[in-house]
Structure formats: structure tokens, C-alpha cells
Regions:
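Subset-of-secretome marker
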Residues: 22-276
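Secretory targeting and sorting signals
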Residues: 1-26
């Protein structure tokens, strides 16, 4: 597996966590769907997350991080650290598997990534620019239609909770000192795909139809924590299972975020080994 192939896999893993921000109307009687709608209206928040992923022969890895998103300005920033399989880390040639990311959602979703993981394929300090919709199109998915202009807002990722099914209360817990009600439920991807051709195309490609999930909702009806496990990609030849837990806090807090200057950017498509 080449360094570029590993880079592609990491990027797709990150994209997978963003794919959930699409389509569907909230079900008024479903408490989780209602909380997702309320949270999506906050526009900005800080977040922490941790995730693990198993991807076919590539093995298992995990990542965690934090960031802030500004939905009004359609931008976001994220810092994360990866725990990679030994072979992958050796091929990438670094002991610092961390990454800084900037999201620009003004036109689809553009991701800028800077990391020591890329030192073998890009000059040190440069940002890799990736057009997510363009990458997805190479995989036969119309991600440009799938993702909306507000994808850089993390509350948009909560929109998949609008397709919750069978939500039930499992208890009451404090999340970062805030009292919440804990719900367990399933996400029905067919509900998301019903009025969204692009998402229906995605589910057909990945073979994913549902996912178990949990949500912690505060007294203001906002999602403070969500946890989802997704299995996908078998139909594409690379079966993947990803579990991610995300905390949302500091709602309404905004921070100016701008893309890096063009002089520091390398386009993903220009990297060598594109056929690997």
C-alpha cells in the first residue's frame, strides 16, 4: 500500500464522518429528531470526538481530536491525532501521526489537511487540498449533490439523527456538567434516502441501510453527545466499520476561520502515484 493510498484512506475515513449531514425532515414526535433540529439551528459550536475504524486489509486505526465550526460562515477547523497500524505508520515515515484540517463549505466541501503524515508526498508545512465531491465522484458517488452548503457546520452532521427510529430513554446522565437525557435508537438510512437521490445512490453503493446510535439531549433540547456505529463499503470492495462519539459544547461561539494561502497549498490530484 503506497503512502498516497494510505492518505486516501485517511481522507475517506474523515469524509465518512461527514457523510451523515444530509437530507430528510425531522419527525415531530421523535425526541431525537427534534433535538437534532434544535441543535442544527445553533450554527456554531465547539466539539471533541474520538473514533475507531476497521477497513479491510488496511487494518484498524483510531483518531481523536477537537475543533470549532462556524455554520454562518460555512467554515471549520479541526485538530486530530491518529493511532495507525505499525505497517502504515512505517510506510508514512513519521512518529507524529497528527493532522490539522480546515473546512471550506462555500462551494460543496473543500478540505485542507496539513500533517507530518504527508511529508513523503508533499513538502513539509504544505496543505493538501481535497475536493470531497470530486473524490467521491471517482468512487461513483455524487457527493456534491449529497452534501449541502452548510456541511462545514458540525450540527449538520446531526441531521442523520432526524431519521432516528425506535428512540427510547435509557437513563439520565451529566455530560460536561450538563444534565441530559440518554436515548438509544437506530438510524434508518432509507428515511434519509427517500427524498434524496444522491443519498440513495450512496446507500446503494455502500450497502448501508441502518446504524445503531445514542444521543444525550439537554433540557434546552440540544444534543450534547452523539455516538454512532456505521458499517459500509462492502459493495465497493473495502468493507469499513467506524464508531464515532462526538461532544458538542460552547454553542453559539464563533471564531474566524480562513483557508490557507494558495502558496502553501498542494492539490490532492497533483500527488504522484494516483493509480495506486
Amino acid at each position: 500500500m503506497t503512502p498516497r493510498r494510505i492518505l486516501s484512506l485517511l481522507a475517506l475515513a474523515l469524509c465518512a464522518s461527514a457523510l451523515v449531514g444530509c437530507g430528510g425532515d425531522a419527525l415531530a414526535l421523535d425526541p431525537v429528531a427534534k433535538a437534532a433540529t434544535t441543535t442544527a439551528k445553533t450554527q456554531a459550536s465547539r466539539f471533541d470526538f474520538h473514533a475507531s475504524m476497521t477497513a479491510g486489509t488496511a487494518g484498524s486505526f483510531s483518531f481523536h481530536g477537537n475543533g470549532i465550526f462556524d455554520g454562518k460562515n460555512k467554515s471549520g477547523w479541526m485538530n486530530m491525532h491518529f493511532s495507525l497500524p505499525a505497517q502504515a505508520q512505517m510506510q508514512l515515515g513519521t512518529t507524529d501521526p497528527s493532522m490539522e484540517m480546515i473546512f471550506d463549505g462555500h462551494h460543496g466541501l473543500i478540505m485542507y489537511m496539513r500533517s507530518p503524515l504527508f511529508d513523503r508526498v508533499v513538502p513539509t508545512g504544505k496543505w493538501v487540498k481535497m475536493d470531497v465531491a470530486k473524490l467521491a465522484k471517482k468512487q461513483g458517488m455524487d457527493l456534491g449533490a449529497l452534501m449541502n452548503a452548510n456541511q462545514a457546520d458540525p450540527s449538520q452532521s446531526l441531521r442523520m439523527l432526524m431519521a432516528s427510529s425506535g428512540a427510547r430513554v435509557t437513563g439520565a446522565e451529566r455530560i460536561r456538567g450538563v444534565e441530559t437525557t440518554h436515548y438509544a435508537f437506530n438510524i434508518d438510512f432509507k428515511k434519509l434516502a427517500h427524498d434524496n437521490r444522491a443519498f440513495r445512490q450512496l446507500t446503494d453503493k455502500t450497502g448501508s441501510i441502518s446504524a445503531p446510535a445514542e444521543a444525550w439531549v439537554d433540557k434546552q433540547g440540544r444534543v450534547r453527545r452523539l455516538s454512532v456505529t456505521m458499517t459500509m463499503g462492502a459493495a465497493l470492495g473495502t468493507p469499513m466499520t467506524m464508531s464515532i462519539t462526538e461532544d458538542l459544547y460552547d454553542f453559539g461561539e464563533r471564531t474566524p476561520i480562513a483557508p490557507p494561502p494558495e502558496s502553501l497549498v498542494v492539490d490532492f490530484d497533483s500527488l504522484s502515484g494516483s493509480s495506486s
